[in-house]
């Protein structure tokens, strides 16, 4: 689900080269005032915390502390995240068969990246959460504890498993107006909806399986690249309103503190305030669409010095570069290919390369659940 399995999944890469891979190294940090990006989870393809924890004793201590705090919020019968992400990463694939493990692994990774960067002296000025990533965003902003965020995520997994089956999501490489026109042409209006706009020419649609397939076929016949995402649920769809209400009832009384960082929501279309019912806002992610480009522009206009992906990979950094070609982006855990020598992320666009040189989206990931 985009709320669980990131709708930022993209179609196969074009022949144009992707940005150079990079891993974070101690002493390498973005300029103060950067915007943290927290993607929807489940699309990273596996654990990436080992590289972060291995970057130095301080980072290792922070990562293990975060994993222990996340574990505190998990059911007792869940696998140990410290074991499957750090001590025995080869066991991760088997552990990820437990519903929600992949999503909580990504949640832990997002929180850990944020904490390690701050410990290195980098001070964020903004945070943007995409779908499920809004939970980690509000943890980063000091609203919820790490353990409470984990509990909320586990509850969301259960609700979506009960309510969201029988549908899915597809990515259309086209702008929102054309995507809506393709839905109409496929005779799927009211069943398939625009769920997520990730970049000016990247639109995710969601709906029941049969009409969703008609939209995909119609898009391809019209010359648009269309990819059915490995997402076994509806998400960002009006049919999930009851699921959102159920989850809200479960999390509405979670203790919260005032925002310590400006948080921008692509679902609400603005920055949150302390007067907002934030659990309600999170629950709305299940049924309401998100539009990322206007939020990225708003954060940029508000003074963000760079955009930093608090996750494994660089999916949202790619969306930034498609929306703001001159923006500076950092992907601390953009994994290097096997056998490649890790390179520190540089301060310039796309880790040191001109952003305009590589605006193409990355390959679509397979689902972890």
Regions found by a protein language model. Give the residues of each.
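FabD-like malonyl-/acyl-CoA
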Residues: 3-8, 19-182, 225-231, 306-325, ...
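Short, charged, surface-exposed secondary-structure boundary motifs
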Residues: 238-239, 337-345
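Gly/Ser-centered flexible loop/linker motifs
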Residues: 179-200
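Short amphipathic alpha-helices in soluble, non-transmembrane regions
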Residues: 183-186, 212-222
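Helix N-cap motif at beta-to-alpha junctions
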Residues: 175-176, 207-212
């Amino acid at each position: 689900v985009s709320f669980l399995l990131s709708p930022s999944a993209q179609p196969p890469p074009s022949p144009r080269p992707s940005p150079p891979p990079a891993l974070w190294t101690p002493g390498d940090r973005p300029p103060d005032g950067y915007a943290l990006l927290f993607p929807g989870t489940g699309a990273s393809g596996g654990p990436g915390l080992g590289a972060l924890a291995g970057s130095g004793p301080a980072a290792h201590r922070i990562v293990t502390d975060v994993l222990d705090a996340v574990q505190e919020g998990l059911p007792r019968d869940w696998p140990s995240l410290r074991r499957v992400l750090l001590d025995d990463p080869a066991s991760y694939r088997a552990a990820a068969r437990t519903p929600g493990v992949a999503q909580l692994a990504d949640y832990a990774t997002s929180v850990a990246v944020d904490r390690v960067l701050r410990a290195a002296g980098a001070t964020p000025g903004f945070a943007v959460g995409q779908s499920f990533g809004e939970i980690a965003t509000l943890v980063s902003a000091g609203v919820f504890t790490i353990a409470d965020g984990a509990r909320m995520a586990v509850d969301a997994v259960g609700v979506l498993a009960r309510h969201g089956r029988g549908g899915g999501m597809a990515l259309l490489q086209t702008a929102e107006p054309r995507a809506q026109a393709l839905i109409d042409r496929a005779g799927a209006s009211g069943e398939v909806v625009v769920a997520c706009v990730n970049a000016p020419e990247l639109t995710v649609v969601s709906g029941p399986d049969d009409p969703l397939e008609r939209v995909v076929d119609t898009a391809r016949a019209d010359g648009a690249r269309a990819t059915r995402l490995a997402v076994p649920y509806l998400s960002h769809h009006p049919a999930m309103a009851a699921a959102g209400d159920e989850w809200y009832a479960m999390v509405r009384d979670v203790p919260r503190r005032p925002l310590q960082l400006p948080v921008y929501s692509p679902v609400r279309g603005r920055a949150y305030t302390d007067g907002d019912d934030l659990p309600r806002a999170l629950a709305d992610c299940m049924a309401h669409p998100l539009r990322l480009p206007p939020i990225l522009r708003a954060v940029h206009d508000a003074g963000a010095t760079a955009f930093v992906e608090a996750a494994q990979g660089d999916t949202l950094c790619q969306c930034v570069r498609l929306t703001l070609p001159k923006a500076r982006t950092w992907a601390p855990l953009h994994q290097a290919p096997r056998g490649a020598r890790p390179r520190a992320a540089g301060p310039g666009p796309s880790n040191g390369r001109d952003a305009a040189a590589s605006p193409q989206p990355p390959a679509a990931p397979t689902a972890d659940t």
